[in-house]
Amino acid sequence: MIMRMMNIADFDETSIEIIGDNSQHSKQSSNENNREVVLKFAAKHQDIRAVGIMLKESVGLGLATPPGLSGFVGGRPKPSPIVRLFSFLIDKDQVNVTIDNGSSKNEIKIPPSDEFDLNSIEQTTAPDFEDANEKFVDVPLIKVAYGRSGDKGNKANIGIISRDPKFYPAICNFLDEKVVKDCFADFLEGSVERYFLPGSNSINFILNDVLGGGGPASLRNDPQGKAYAQILLDQMIPIPEKLLS
């Protein structure tokens, strides 16, 4: 109502997360036994006044909240600008390379090289997996693998490493792009890529357009996807029972 009176358009983007109630776990039901959760909300707008109005209204949390609700941040937050990362390629002959050793600067000439052919890379395939007459047991992925994740702009990178080489073929067989896509369905706007690294018994997943802009451009509480590996490790995966004994 206030924004309408001031002829200010609606927010460009909003984010509401209930931390502590599986807000990061796609398609998973809430935990009704939770006794404490944190409500986080954020918004984007081209007019700083709109964000200021929202933050001013949030002051009411410290003055007249419903029973059982409290605001724990110190003072009223201030609107902050959105900073985005834009990466691109440029011909090396357009960039001067200089070495500065403190006392002098020396320009280095880098001769042009042949253009790299992406098609020359041979992608490794999944290892053979024989599942005939096998009895399977569903276990959390964390029981048979380690995980680590991070970001590059608006992409998330998840590495999964088998705890034992014997689990690797089964993990590769069942942990595919669809499983990962379903796991992050609430966030994922792009595709999922899978790469096999048999030398380390691991898989690398790249999730495109999954971080809401990534870094300071994202409104989420995990804009760098640092918890994504742990979320994926919660997924159930079928493993031959004989390998678990």
Positions of the model-derived regions?
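C-terminal beta-rich recognition modules with glycine/proline-rich loops and embedded aromatic residues
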Residues: N119-S120, I158, P169, A217
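Extended active-site and interfacial segments that coordinate phosphate-rich ligands
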Residues: E57, L175-F184, R220-A229
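Hydrophobic/aromatic-rich, well-ordered segments within soluble, folded domains that form packed cores
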Residues: A145-C183
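Bergerat-fold GHKL/Histidine-kinase-like ATPase
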Residues: L141-I142
